[in-house]
């Protein structure tokens, strides 16, 4: 083989090596680009997963906050209801603490009124006594009325079963039907609660 042929052969080998090197470089470049693209997709997937986790955690936190807010509102409502009930019970106890005591006073009032009605107003001897009893009765009524005790004296009024107790029913040309003709015994109420109904005669 001549020198010229050797030289040409070497040049061909060099060209072939250069082509192979370029091919390998291109292959490596393509591989690198694929790796970069894969890494980017992997990072994106990981980011989206973290975002999803954060969103789920946020929703869970919001739900817990809502539950706690509802619990606080319920607790406040229960406290308010308890406070209102307590105030009502205290007010009720205050109003009706004298209920039993007032019931015990009613016979005394009845006896004073019977004494006034039975007294001989024409007698000079009885007159001073009657005045004393009348004054005592008035003072007594004025005093107990300050504590919410009120008499029920419904003569001439329509019969009310919540306030009156019908002891007798009679026909009457002078009264409308279901009207109280006569009060046999006055009734009393304490702060709006009947402690004794009025005993009455009702027109038929």
Swiss-Prot record:
Region listing for Disordered, in residue ranges: 1-37
Q: Does the keyword Chaperone apply?
A: yes
Its GO biological process terms? protein folding
One MF term in GO for this entry? Answer: protein homodimerization activity
Q: Name the Pfam families on file.
A: GrpE
Q: Tell me the Gene3D superfamilies matching this sequence.
A: 3.90.20.20, Head domain of nucleotide exchange factor GrpE (2.30.22.10)
Q: Which PANTHER family match?
A: GRPE PROTEIN, GRPE PROTEIN HOMOLOG, MITOCHONDRIAL
State what protein this is by name.
Protein GrpE
The gene it comes from is: grpE
């Amino acid at each position: 083989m001549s020198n010229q042929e050797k030289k040409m052969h070497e040049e061909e080998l060099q060209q072939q090596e250069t082509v192979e090197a370029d091919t390998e470089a291109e292959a490596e470049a393509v591989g690198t680009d694929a790796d970069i693209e894969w890494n980017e997709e992997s990072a994106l997937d990981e980011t989206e997963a973290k975002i999803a986790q954060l969103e789920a955690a946020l929703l869970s936190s919001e739900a817990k906050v809502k539950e706690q807010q509802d619990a606080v509102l319920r607790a406040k409502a229960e406290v308010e209801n308890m406070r209102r009930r307590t105030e009502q019970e205290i007010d009720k106890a205050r109003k009706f603490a004298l209920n039993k005591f007032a019931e015990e006073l009613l016979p005394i009032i009845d006896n004073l009124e019977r004494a006034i009605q039975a007294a001989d107003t024409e007698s000079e001897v009885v007159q001073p006594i009657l005045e004393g009893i009348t004054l005592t009765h008035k003072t007594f009524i004025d005093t107990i009325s300050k504590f919410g005790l009120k008499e029920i004296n419904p003569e001439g009024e329509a019969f009310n079963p919540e306030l009156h107790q019908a002891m007798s029913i009679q026909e009457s040309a002078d009264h409308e039907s279901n009207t109280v003709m006569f009060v046999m015994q006055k009734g009393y109420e304490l702060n709006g609660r009947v402690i004794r109904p009025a005993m009455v005669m009702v027109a038929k």
